[in-house]
């Protein structure tokens, strides 16, 4: 496949994940979520837990595609890699500052600024994966990804790393390096879901996506391409499920079993969409998600800022309490708020797509 040609199935799957992230993060009222749109409180797995790791997996694929133009040579690619990684981290910090500031009303108080977050994790994991891509043979990627998962599992195994307690090594490292005030919810949940130690398995997530990106680009035959994705996805899903008996599925800890399971689901989902969209050319049913997937990071950042402003201006509460709750009730009304907010963000995506504007960070 030509790496300069946009892969519609990849855009669509990215769009599905971004739409899912917006729905999960923007409900009408906290606590009134359908189970599918609520994260597992600790151990366990729900559809809501899938969207972010799937996006990271897809970022691994995009990393392979974007570095093809540099032929994976370090010298020409290094400036782009560092610039993009730092930009993602910077945007994440600005977003955290903005949300914290409008809540407190103090735009100069950084004492409770969350240092890690979704964009920061994307920036760090992209940077590490991309630097590895231009410095080591790609055949070592999958073994290295597995080694990182094993190392993290050992940390968890011998550091009480599966328990929701103050002596969990994952949370202890987050607290020691970041400080409780700079963690998610000021450390009240013991660990930061995008924390320091759990970045290790998150890098593995992106690296596995990178391997699948190599399959998509290097294998020219669609049948072989889909077969390879299917085999990898099935293997990862099966191993992740088996491993979950010894290593619980846990998004907050980004456990090794969670990485393997979600990578498996992502690979199988992409194989299915490749068949439906790129082979069978059934595209018309997916244009809605393409609008989100063509500019995923722009839509995500916009949704976070817009969502924060709607809460700050009390529009969020007014719409839910005075309109959606009386019409639909607590749970469905809360869900409908997310749907309307999703459509609102989709307008931006639609305009950018129709004008063929693709904003790359």
For each feature predicted by the language model, list its residue ranges.
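Alpha-helical transmembrane segments and their immediate juxtamembrane cytosolic regions
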Residues: 1-361
